[in-house]
């Protein structure tokens, strides 16, 4: 195993330094081969065992300054202390004598203290030399590396330039496909997953659990799901089992869909035919630990970060791991390789970031994206030393996984000014999940932080005071839009109750379109935009504008809040058309049989909203008829005549 070779190399480095200290600086002591050999073998064994332990437990990445071999400073430091024990003991005794004398007490020791006769002065020299090297390299040199790679303006600009950022002139975000909006939060997924854990009659909950933080959003076969692994309840369960039974799948687009528990032998279209059990997990013991398994497989030359459980198109479980290497001293981690680990067999395959399978949703870690954008916000338009904070920006939220395109998600990060009193955005980043590329949209003035949830929760429709569990920023109908999930909190998670949609530029509780289903909320929102005249009367969600002309077959009106909405069926059309009263004053007069014309957006939905509307049957442009060569005639007024009461 590579671990034994690395430990051997580390031990040789430590012993070489200690030997230099003993023989080079302890020359006052006569060289005794047997004594030296006994000392060398003893410390060699000690450092080899200690090196194995450090490598096995901490898995240091062999990259960056000193090629990552600074981990040997710990064995060197401990070995140096052990070599100094013969000197430290009498020194501590002398300090005790001095302390006693200063307090007017007699020392408890008798006689003069000194270094024991059997103490090797060469060992003391080795210990002192080892401590000097450890302190010099671990503190002084490491500190200088940090200073000369991250301090001062040139280094700050270099850090800000690590992400490849393009600036958009338009604030319009890419359009979102409304058919793939996330309606299940991580807490809702955790609640549904907990319910399914004990549903198969195997009492799996007594041995395994699902960490709510491990639910991972991902696209599988053009649909969004949450996936979470079953984990061991305790070390004793781990010791008695070589794998966990499998994983849980929760539909992220449909909160009413039943979750599924995938184990070996499970019969479901959303479960693999075999190999559902997970032999390697983050946090498992010994070689079952995922990162340790990968490290021991030879991937020691980078930082192994962000292990993510992802299912391929056959719903087979795999772990994706990002292998990062620093570009500026100890920092500036850049994605070097993508490792794909079969969660069932442990087979490891490496890819370059651009050649990774397309079904892997993300290989750029969220923490790395945050660090990149923090550097960019601090230094791209401001100097390194900037106590005023002028020109600086900061991330206003953690990266959110956004599926504008179902097959190509991006990290969405809202930016704000560096001022802690600022509650609005300066722009929005969309960061590629497969490459070090980001696009900045100058979408300024959006609400940020807790005020988004609080404002949306204040809508009058939320009469039961449900909690806003999550919000995501989408581009719907050419409008930046917050989509929020209303939930009822429980001890084991959250229960979906409703969805709220609001224009991000007009964040107000009274503007929230609150419905129990997404389709109804989208319909309300589109009508609200039409009424407000926003963004081309409702804009497009990846649809095209079409014109329809035909005869009304059915028409009916409904009241939605303060809006009157007309629903129409037109001959020869397989769609239901809606129109807000604000579109035309003719709408209350429309009857079956009237010929109408209008434009709408074809988005694939069965219900579409008119952007323009006119009833061709109702002609309001006609004028009184004038006889040839004459003047318009008026109709004589009819005056009612009184009648006498009948005689009795």
Predicted segment positions?
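Nucleotide/phosphate-binding sheet-loop regions of phosphoryl- and nucleotidyl-transfer enzymes
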Residues: 1
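Soluble extracytoplasmic regions of secretory-pathway and membrane proteins
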Residues: 4-632, 636, 640, 646-648
């Amino acid at each position: 195993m590579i671990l034994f070779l690395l430990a051997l190399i580390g031990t040789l480095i430590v012993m070489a330094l200690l030997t230099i200290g003993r023989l080079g600086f302890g020359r006052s002591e006569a060289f005794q081969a047997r004594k030296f050999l006994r000392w060398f073998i003893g410390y060699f064994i000690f450092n080899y065992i200690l090196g194995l332990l450090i490598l096995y437990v901490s898995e240091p990445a062999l990259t960056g300054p000193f090629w990552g071999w600074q981990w040997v400073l710990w064995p060197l430091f401990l070995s140096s202390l052990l070599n100094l024990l013969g000197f430290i003991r009498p020194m501590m005794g002398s300090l005790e004598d001095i302390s006693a004398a200063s307090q007017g007490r007699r020392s408890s020791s008798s006689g003069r203290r000194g270094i024991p006769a059997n103490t090797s002065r060469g060992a003391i020299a080795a210990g002192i030399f080892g401590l000097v090297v450890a302190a010099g390299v671990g503190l002084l040199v490491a500190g200088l590396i940090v200073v000369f790679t991250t301090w001062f303006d040139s280094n700050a600009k270099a850090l800000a330039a690590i992400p490849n950022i393009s600036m958009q002139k338009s604030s319009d975000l890419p359009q979102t496909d409304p058919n793939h909006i996330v309606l299940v939060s991580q807490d809702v997924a955790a609640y549904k997953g907990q319910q399914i854990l004990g549903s198969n009659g195997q009492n799996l909950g007594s041995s395994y659990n699902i960490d709510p933080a491990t639910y991972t959003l991902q696209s599988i076969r053009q649909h969004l799901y949450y996936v979470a692994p079953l984990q061991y309840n305790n070390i004793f369960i781990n010791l008695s089992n070589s794998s966990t039974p499998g994983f849980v799948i929760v539909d992220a687009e449909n909160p009413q869909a039943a979750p599924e528990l995938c184990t070996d032998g499970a019969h479901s279209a959303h479960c693999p035919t075999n190999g559902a059990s997970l032999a390697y997990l983050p946090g498992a013991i010994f070689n079952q630990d995922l990162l340790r398994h990968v490290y021991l497989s030879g991937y020691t030359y980078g930082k192994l970060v962000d292990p993510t459980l992802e299912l391929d198109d056959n719903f087979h479980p795999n772990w994706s791991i990002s292998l990062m290497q620093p570009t500026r001293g100890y920092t500036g981690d850049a994605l070097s390789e993508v490792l794909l680990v079969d969660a069932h067999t442990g087979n490891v395959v490496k890819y370059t970031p651009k050649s990774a399978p397309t079904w892997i949703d993300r290989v750029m870690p969220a923490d790395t994206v945050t660090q990149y954008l923090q550097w960019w916000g601090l230094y791209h338009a401001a100097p390194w030393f900037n106590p005023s904070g002028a020109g600086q920006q900061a991330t206003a939220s953690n990266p959110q996984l956004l599926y504008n395109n179902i097959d190509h998600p991006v990290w969405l990060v809202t930016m704000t000014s560096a001022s802690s009193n600022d509650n609005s955005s300066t722009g929005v980043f969309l960061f590629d999940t497969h490459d070090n590329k980001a696009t900045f949209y100058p979408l300024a003035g959006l609400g940020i932080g807790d005020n988004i949830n609080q404002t949306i929760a204040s809508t009058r429709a939320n009469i039961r005071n449900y909690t806003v569990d999550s919000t995501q920023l989408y581009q719907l109908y050419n409008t930046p839009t917050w989509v929020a999930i209303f939930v009822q909190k429980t001890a084991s998670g959250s229960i979906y109750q409703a969805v709220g949609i609001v224009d991000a530029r007009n964040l107000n509780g009274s503007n929230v379109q609150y419905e129990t289903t997404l389709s109804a909320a989208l319909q309300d929102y589109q009508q609200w935009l039409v009424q407000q005249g926003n963004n081309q009367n409702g804009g497009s969600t990846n649809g095209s504008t079409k014109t329809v002309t035909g005869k009304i077959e059915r028409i009916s009106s409904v009241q939605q809040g303060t809006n009157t909405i007309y629903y129409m069926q037109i001959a020869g059309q397989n769609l239901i058309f809606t129109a807000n009263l604000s579109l035309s004053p003719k709408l209350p007069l429309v009857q079956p049989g009237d010929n109408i014309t209008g434009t709408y957006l074809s988005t694939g939905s069965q219900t579409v909203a008119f952007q323009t509307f006119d009833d061709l049957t109702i002609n309001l442009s006609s004028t009184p008829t004038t006889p040839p060569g004459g003047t318009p005639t008026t109709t004589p007024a009819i005056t009612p005549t009184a009648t006498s009461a009948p005689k009795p």
